[in-house]
Amino acid sequence: MIIQAVNISVFDNKNTNIKIAIIGDYMGKFLSEIKQNLSSNSLVWIKPIEDETDLWYAVEECKITSGQMEYVNPASFSVGRAYLDPENNVPCVIYNNENKRVGFISFRKIVLNKKGFNWSFYIDKNYQNKDLGRATAESAIKTLKNVDSNMPIFLTTEQNNELAQRLYINLGFRKADFLDGDDLVFIHE
């Protein structure tokens, strides 16, 4: 059984840090499928958040550069989403080949208008530029295709995030002819 206990940082319009506690437990089918099909490579391995140490790392210690903050939601958002919809969300920590925590990824099953998978991830600023982002994306693709090879993967990115766009195209995604709000959508089938 996975135990979630997290303090989510929320900032109001006066930039006051407000802590919200979420405590719950779950063991959903999607989590079970992800755990059975997790893929690793020579640079990274991915593990669902199963203890407070990983949870604390994901929501408090794992940091990105200030220039990247506009591109990703904080881990606390994904952990909160998993609490509200545990059947379709699996937050995880990314480890490098030296067993050090180096990032955060959250797998998501899309069940609304289009069926498919999605993920959101980032590498800690202290471990960037070491090919860990690409290695994580490759492992994520393999993991999700092992869960269901017929399910497409939909990723979104800001229109000015050219680095993510190049990565997605190099990994076999194609740019969709529709947007998600203002964001570009990439599809891996």
What is each residue range found by the language model?
Residues Q4-K14, K19-S40:
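Acyl-donor-binding surface of acyltransferase catalytic domains
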Residues F154-Q165, G181-D183:
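Conserved beta-strand-loop-alpha-helix junction that forms the acyl-donor binding cleft
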Residues N129-K142, R166, N170:
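Conserved acetyl-CoA-binding loop-helix of GNAT-fold acetyltransferases
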Residues D124-K130, Q159-N160:
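Active-site acidic-Proline motif in GNAT/NAT acetyltransferases
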Residues F30, S39-S120, D124-N126, T143, ...:
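Acetyl-CoA-dependent GNAT
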